Amino acid sequence: MENGLGNRSNKLIRDSKRTQYLDYLPPYQADTVNDVVNEIRAADRESLGILQNVTHEASQPFQPQDHPSEAAALLMFHSSSIYNKRCLMAYHNLRLQRLRQYCWSGGKRMESCLDTSLSTYERDYLTRYSELLAAYKGAWSELDLTGSLVPPKNLFIDVRVLKDVGDIETEYGTINLTKNSQLHVRATDVERLIAQGFLAKL
């Protein structure tokens, strides 16, 4: 066990760093997560065994200065458990951040991979978070809470239609968005469609 302490959790973090800027969410690494959890439990068992042996032999509370080798082993197992737990929390927190970003953007870029990429708990989280967000936005229906906080440099932009959308109503009238057409439109009228992948900004 000593030879591999922290290796699996280190792999989780390295993989997370490599994939954090992808347009899709990579599959949940259930096997690696389970390996890290088992390593934490094994470290706890080793620590408990050391303490039981020392206290049984000495018939008194454990004193690190009296048992330096055992104290060093306990410190090693404790440190590895803390490290593994921090890595697990960082891995899961990063994935939850991506799911929250997905909900707030209202985009569909990740939809194709969500069914196969999420764990059962992540699916539950996504469903409940989406419901909470919908209820929150419903209370402020006159505002677009998912819009960008950075004002556009130009009021009007050129876009190319990637997928047929049909007619959309704007303040200046109806716009027909057919695939492969290019239009000069107001940025605020189409920013949601750009985020959802229907349009591309030129």
Curated annotation (Swiss-Prot):
GO BP term, example: DNA strand elongation involved in mitotic DNA replication
Keywords: Cytoplasm, DNA replication, Nucleus
Record-annotated membrane-spanning stretches: none
InterPro entries: GINS_A, GINS_bundle-like_dom_sf, GINS_Psf1, PSF1_C
GO cellular component, one term: cytosol
SUPFAM superfamilies: GINS helical bundle-like
Residues forming coiled coils: none
Compartment(s) of residence: Cytoplasm; Nucleus
Family recorded in the similarity comment: Belongs to the GINS1/PSF1 family.
Subunit structure: Component of the GINS complex which is a heterotetramer of sld5, psf1, psf2 and psf3.
Function: The GINS complex plays an essential role in the initiation of DNA replication.
Protein name: DNA replication complex GINS protein psf1
